[in-house]
């Protein structure tokens, strides 16, 4: 096989990954995302929901979920990752405003702490409705915390 053709399988995978990233980028720019709510129950009383974990889902143009495993590691350290965190926070806080007894955990990257638009979303909602802070749980991914521990320490102090 001529060297310039490369490995066909590797080329197909790279092409698929590029197409997936472009779909994610387009979906995020159009805010074509939704939250999936995973209940977290109490150990003492498994029939009682303690809170919900709000998981962001990016939708393609046919409204199907693009599996996060296909893009998350590539975007974690990019602006696109920060934009997804902003959308998750905005959608989660909006749901909490609409449902006053809703307690949510929202996943995020530690890098989003230093991302001005993310902090603006958080501050805008908390300034309008301070009780949201009592019901909001921010779940910072372990991998991102290990990469920028100083940001997390400053945010939590």
Q: Residue spans of the language-model regions?
A:
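Flexible, glycine/charge-rich interdomain/linker segments that couple
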Residues: 1-18, 101-110
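Signal-transducing alpha-helical linker
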Residues: 9-12, 16-19, 76, 80-85, ...
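Short amphipathic alpha-helical segments and helix-helix/interface helices
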Residues: 25, 123, 152-157
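Residues at alpha-helix boundaries and the short loops/turns that link adjacent helices
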Residues: 27, 62-65, 78, 82-83, ...
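Catalytic core of bacterial c-di-GMP phosphodiesterases, primarily the EAL and HD-GYP domains
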Residues: 48-53, 80-151
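Conserved long alpha-helical elements within nucleotide-processing catalytic cores of c-di-GMP signaling
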Residues: 69-73, 82, 157
